[in-house]
Amino acid sequence: MIQVTCDQKNYEVLEGTTAAELAKQLKNSHQFIGVLINERPRDLSTHLNEGDTLVFLTSEDPEGREIFLHTSAHLLAQAVLRLWPDAIPTIGPVIDHGFYYDFANLSISESDFPLIEDTVKQIVDEKLAISRFTYGDKQQALAQFPQNPFKTELIRELPENEEISAYSQGEFFDLCRGPHLPSTAHVKAFKVLRTSAAYWRGDPSRESLVRIYGTSFPTSKELRAHLEQIEEAKKRDHRVLGAKLDLFSQQESSPGMPFFHPRGMIVWDALIRYWKQLHTAAGYKEILTPQLMNRQLWEVSGHWDNYKANMYTLQIDDEDYAIKPMNCPGCMLYYKTRLHSYKEFPLRVAEVGHVHRQEASGALSGLMRVRAFHQDDAHVFLTPEQVEEETLNILQLVSTLYGTFGLEYHLELSTRPEKDTIGDDSLWELATDALNRALVQSGTPFIVRPGEGAFYGPKIDIHVKDAIQRTWQCGTIQLDMFLPERFELEYTTAQGTKSVPVMLHRALFGSIERFLGILIENFKGRFPLWLSPEQVRIITVADRHIPRAKELEEAWKRLGLVVTLDDSSESVSKKIRNAQNMQVNYMITLGDHEINENVLAVRTRDNRVINDVSVERFLNTILEEKNSLSLTALL
């Protein structure tokens, strides 16, 4: 007999017992599709060992969802091979909200999608058992794929001592680490989404492939909800809205480096202005460091050896330089410009820095994935005893900032990786415990990601949920035990000795471009007044009303409002439609009655009309709406 643990209970089972056999002793075992054994995702068919700790997975768990989608990718490949036996499968990974599989020697169109889906349904109805098997060595594995140069390339690159596994379901088998579902019967709802061209290993010099994207769910209801979400996401696409609202553009001359238009800069400036106010009140000092720094700096920071492939480099006077991909090293140099005392700690230093990173052209996407962006970094220098309290301060800042935009979020604590880390065990334990206690005190829900911290320290990641329930990783709080030592930073302790400070590195927006993209989609282009690129548009009925309109425009601009005037010859109804299409918060129509009575006809972008509003009431209301950072209209 061996003893294992599940749900904090101990179980004695026979040697050779599988996770699936243990699951039969538990409630709702029919929902289990996989298992975490000692925190690693595994098949239900996995044999248990003495001391194992188990957590059974359903399709609602992140790890279970990944297993579900991974198996669905195999179903897609099996269906394609049944329909086009000469196709050559390559790889089929899980991606956000679905999966894809790449094929060589295949040509299909959208008209083939129903045929693929019908074939997948047949495979599901066959309830094929999914089995894992391993190869004794590389030669045995290579013999399994004699006609597939892609699989053989992958096999040859594996380390000599690495276990090589494959999975089979019916006539189909595929090289794969797994884990997978117990059978094909679980995939009740399957959808082919689109196809695209691809290259083997993303290299344009290699073989051309056809990529088929899909998604799947345990029920048709869940699939329908997901497809509705996709349609809603299309309506909210920040790239479409960014062009429609004249906020930003992408130019072929500079891929992945957005061009912000005047209207976009109004939103940008409002974001930065709010960020500065928030950080000034929280005791941060702002700096600005250079874009370009020499190789020596990047060697000290470790970027030259470990990150050079993602950096833009150049030579000046025979010396190597790089455009900064991160703000951190520049802040280290600022810290070293003078001596520091423990009395200054926590020393909070913030920077909105423009950084550049090499990204594959195929990975670029609007404002979400770019090569040039602004990062709102801050570095807090402190003593080990101050870590918990300062982390709590940062978490309160996070709550304030995201609450201002009406964004829900959750936090994830990533702990020490198993290998290739710096710092001794006691320091890691102290740092992780401090972050954990701060999270508990904050009262914000969080989950723990064992082993997913950075090599230089544990971290807290901020995941935002938008209006259509998508999640985005934005900000981060990282305890860095690496850079202060690399740059030989020091401070004077209370005892008069020199010591290396602890450093908390944090970003709240993360990439400001990306955060703006999230806001555009979350608000569907309908920005709250304080963020809006056009808060008020004055619409004249006739030319004789233009002088009064200009008078109001100039007066309101002096109050800090973003006001425009439409005195064109278009009809009033057309002017109103134009303003509504640009998501202007308030439209003011000026005619004879309004001028004679010194009142305003106000129309909201929701098409509510409020007549005979006094100028004083209108201004007082919208200035309150703007200054209070209200997310809803107050008029």
From Swiss-Prot:
GO molecular function: ATP binding; metal ion binding; threonine-tRNA ligase activity; tRNA binding
SMART domains in the cross-refs: tRNA_SAD (SM00863)
Keyword Flavoprotein: no
Residues the record lists as binding Zn(2+): C328, H379, H505
Record's GO cellular component terms: cytoplasm
Enzyme class: ligase
Catalysed reactions listed for this entry: tRNA(Thr) + L-threonine + ATP = L-threonyl-tRNA(Thr) + AMP + diphosphate + H(+)
InterPro entries in UniProt: aa-tRNA-synt_IIb (IPR002314), aa-tRNA-synth_II (IPR006195), aa-tRNA-synth_II/BPL/LPL (IPR045864), Anticodon-bd (IPR004154), Anticodon-bd_dom_sf (IPR036621), Mopterin_synth/thiamin_S_b (IPR016155), TGS (IPR004095), Thr-tRNA-ligase_IIa (IPR002320)
Segments for region (Catalytic): 237-528
Cofactor(s), by name: Zn(2+)
Subcellular compartments: Cytoplasm
Domain TGS: 1-58
Stored Pfam families: HGTP_anticodon, TGS, tRNA-synt_2b, tRNA_SAD
Keywords, in A-Z order: Aminoacyl-tRNA synthetase, ATP-binding, Cytoplasm, Ligase, Metal-binding, Nucleotide-binding, Protein biosynthesis, RNA-binding, tRNA-binding, Zinc
Keyword match tRNA-binding: yes
Cofactor remark from the record: Binds 1 zinc ion per subunit.
GO terms for biological process, alphabetical: threonyl-tRNA aminoacylation
EC number(s) recorded for this UniProt protein: 6.1.1.3
SUPFAM superfamilies, A to Z: Class II aaRS ABD-related (SSF52954), Class II aaRS and biotin synthetases (SSF55681), MoaD/ThiS (SSF54285), ThrRS/AlaRS common domain (SSF55186)
Subunit structure: Homodimer.
Family under the similarity heading: Belongs to the class-II aminoacyl-tRNA synthetase family.
Biological role: Catalyzes the attachment of threonine to tRNA(Thr) in a two-step reaction: L-threonine is first activated by ATP to form Thr-AMP and then transferred to the acceptor end of tRNA(Thr). Also edits incorrectly charged L-seryl-tRNA(Thr).
The protein, known as: Threonine--tRNA ligase
